[in-house]
Amino acid sequence: MAKITKEIVFGNHKLILETGEVARQADGAVMASMNGTQVLVTVVWKKDGGESNDFFPLTVNYQEKFYAIGKIPGGFNKREGRPSDNETLISRLIDRPIRPLFPDNFFNEVQIIATVLSLNPEVSPDIIAMIGASAALSISGVPFNGPIGAARVGYKDGVYLLNPSRKEQEESKLDLVIAGTKDAILMVESEAQELSEDIMRGAMLYGHEMMKNVIKSIEELARDVGKSKPEWKAPEIDTVLKARINDVARNEVEAAYLIKDKQQRYQRLDELREQTISALLAENDELNADVIANMFGELERSIVRNRILDGEPRIDGRDHRTVRPISIRTKFLERTHGSCLFTRGETQAIVVATLGNERDAQILDGISGESRDRFMLHYNFPPYSVGETGQVGSPKRREIGHGRLAKRALMAVLPDANEFPYVLRIVSEITESNGSSSMATVCGTSLALMDAGVPLKAPVAGVAMGLIKEGDRYAVLTDILGDEDHLGDMDFKVAGTEKGITALQMDIKISGITNEIMEQALEQALEGRTHILGVMNNALAEHRTELSQHAPRITTMKVAEDKIRTIIGKGGATIKGLIESTGVSIDIDDSGVVQLFSPDKMALEEAQKQIKALIAEIEVGQTYQGKVSKIVDFGAFINLLPGKDGLLHISQICADRTQKVEEVLQEGQEIEVFVAGIDKQGRVKLEWKDKPQAEAKEVEDAPVSATFLTMEEQSEEINSGNKISEEEE
C-alpha cells in the first residue's frame, strides 16, 4: 500500500496522520504527529476465536520511549521496564471511549499499541495517541462504530483554549480531555480550579465541536485506504428461549430486586440463575448454559431499567435524587497522623493521611523530565470489599485510575508548599464497595487531611451520577449503586467544593446524550455534593489547629545564599554533625531555604538554635558568653559562635607581662567578653568584662600593646592550625 497522509488544522497546531510506510504487517498502523511529537499506533485483531470468549478481550498498551526525548533511562537497567502510572493512565484514556463502539457480542481479541517515538515537551502525546488509535482502528477492518476524535480544553481569562501547550496548561484553570464521535460525547476526564457547572459544560461542548474536523479527516483516511470490513453479525437471539426465561424467572427476579442488602440480593439472584438454567436444561438438554445465563442477565437489566424509567423506587428504595446514608468517624486510627472512616450506604473507605518531609516526595523520572510529587494518593481495592477472593499485590489499572481521579479532585484545595511544607501521602483502603468507591475516597481524603491538620482551602466531596435512557425516556440517578453503574448507560463522577468543580470524569456507553441531559446531571450532582459537604462539615468543619502528637514537625528557615556553605561545611561535615547531634533531618536548597524535620519538638528547636548560631555574625559592641578554646603566649582565643573565635589579648588578662595567661584562664573556661572591634581582615578584638578591678587598673597603667596578632603571629597561628579557616567556618 502506498503512503497516505492527511494534514489537519487543529487549533494552533497541525496534526498529521500517515499510514502505509511503517508497521505494514499490522491490520492498522498510523503515525500521528503534531509539532515534533510523534506517536505510532498499531491495531491487530484476531479474525476468529471469539466464540470461545464470554467477554471482549480488548487490550490497550501506551508506552513512552526515552529515546523520544534523547534520554537514556536511569537506574541499573538501562531499558524501559514496567509501565509507569502515567502510561497506565493514558492507556485507560485511550480504552474508555473506544470500548463502547465495538458491537455487542463481539468477543474477538483486539490489541492496540501506542508508542511515543518523538516528544516535543510542549506538546502532550496523550491526545495524539487517542486520535492515532481511532485512525488505526478505522483502517484495520475490525468492526468498529467510530471513528472518534479527542481534544484537550483549557480555560484562562474567560476563554477556552484548544490543545494548550504545557506552559499554557500551567496558567489554565482547567485541564479537560474529551473524546467522542461526531454525534456524541463518550468520555471526559478533567481537573479544574473550582469552576462552575456552566463553565464545565461549555468546555465539553466546545471540545466536542472542535474535534469534528479530526473525525472528518479520519473518515477520509479510511476511505482512501479502502480496506473492506468483514461481514460480522452478532449471534441471532433465540426469541423462543428468551420468552421462556421470561416466563420462568421474571416474577422471582423482580422480587429479588426488592431485596435492599447487596449480598442477600446477589445470593438470591445466583440461586435463581442456577434454578433457571437447571429447569431449562431439563426441558431441553441441547441448550447452552452460558447462553441461558447471558439471557438471564438481560432479563435483570430490563427489569431494573424499566422500573427506574417508570418512576418506581431504585434497587435500595431511594428516589432518583437521594444520596445514601452517610456516617463519618475521624481520628479512626490511633497512631496515624490523620484518618477517617467514611461510609456511604454499602460503600466504605478507611482513608489515612501521612505527613513527611521533602525527602519523602515521589521522584518521577519520565520522558518529560524528572519531577517530584509532593502529594501522593494510593487507592487499594482488595477483593474482600466485594465479598470475593482474589490476588493481592501490585495495583491494577483500575486502582491507579481511581486514585488519580481522587487526587485530581483535591489538587485545587491543597495549601501552598511555603504555607505547609509537608509532603502528603494518602492511602484509601476500600473495605466495602457497592458503587462510587472513588468518590468515597475523595470525601475520606478531604476529611483525613483536615484530621491531620492540613489547612485545605475548602472541603471537597464527590458523587457519582448515572443514567438510564430508552428512546426519549431517561432518568438521571444520584449516587449510583454498583448495579446501576453496570446496568446503566453512564458513569458520571463529579467532585468539588461549595464554590465549584475540581474534578469530573464521565464515561457514556450510548450515543445521544443531549445537552439537556448533561445539564440535569450537573445540576443533580451539585445538589448531591452540597448535601454530602453538609454531612462532612458536621463531622469536621475545619482542619485541626494542632498536628497529631505522632506527626513529625517541620520548621523552615531562610538563610542568605552565602551562608549555605557555612551550614554544610567542608565535605558536608558541619551539616552531618548537626544531624547526628540533634537527630533532626536537615535539607537545604540552592536558594537558602533550610527545612528541619523531626518528630521531637525539642530536638527541632535545638537544631534551629545551632543553625542560627552557625550563620550569626559577630557584632561590635555586643557582649558574648564565650569559651576559652586555646591559650597562647600572647593571650587566649575565645570561641564566641560556632566556628568563630576572637582574641583576648594578654593585656586584657594579666596584671603585668610577667604573669602567664594559664594562671588566670584555662581551656574550656567560660567567660563574658565584649567585642571591642573587628579589623579589615576580620580579626576580632575582645575585652574581658568581669576581670578583677585590680587587674583592670594595672592594665590601664600598662603600656598599650598591639591588641591584634602581629602579621608574623597571625601567620604562625594559621600555619599551626590554631585559627579556624574560612573553609571550616
From Swiss-Prot:
InterPro entries: ExoRNase_PH_dom1 (IPR001247), ExoRNase_PH_dom2 (IPR015847), ExoRNase_PH_dom2_sf (IPR036345), KH_dom (IPR004087), KH_dom_type_1 (IPR004088), KH_dom_type_1_sf (IPR036612), NA-bd_OB-fold (IPR012340), PNPase (IPR012162). Keywords: Cytoplasm, Magnesium, Metal-binding, Nucleotidyltransferase, RNA-binding, Transferase. PANTHER family: POLYRIBONUCLEOTIDE NUCLEOTIDYLTRANSFERASE, POLYRIBONUCLEOTIDE NUCLEOTIDYLTRANSFERASE 1, MITOCHONDRIAL. Residues 621-689 form the S1 motif domain. Its EC number is 2.7.7.8. Involved in mRNA degradation. Catalyzes the phosphorolysis of single-stranded polyribonucleotides processively in the 3'- to 5'-direction. SUPFAM superfamilies: Eukaryotic type KH-domain (KH-domain type I), Nucleic acid-binding proteins, Ribonuclease PH domain 2-like, Ribosomal protein S5 domain 2-like. Component of the RNA degradosome, which is a multiprotein complex involved in RNA processing and mRNA degradation. Belongs to the polyribonucleotide nucleotidyltransferase family. Residues 552-611 form the KH domain. GO terms for molecular function: 3'-5'-RNA exonuclease activity; magnesium ion binding; polyribonucleotide nucleotidyltransferase activity; RNA binding. CDD domains: KH-I_PNPase (cd02393), RNase_PH_PNPase_1 (cd11363), RNase_PH_PNPase_2 (cd11364), S1_PNPase (cd04472). Mg(2+) binds at D485, D491. It catalyses: RNA(n+1) + phosphate = RNA(n) + a ribonucleoside 5'-diphosphate. It comes from Legionella pneumophila subsp. pneumophila (strain Philadelphia 1 / ATCC 33152 / DSM 7513). One of its GO terms (cellular component) is cytosol. This is Polyribonucleotide nucleotidyltransferase.
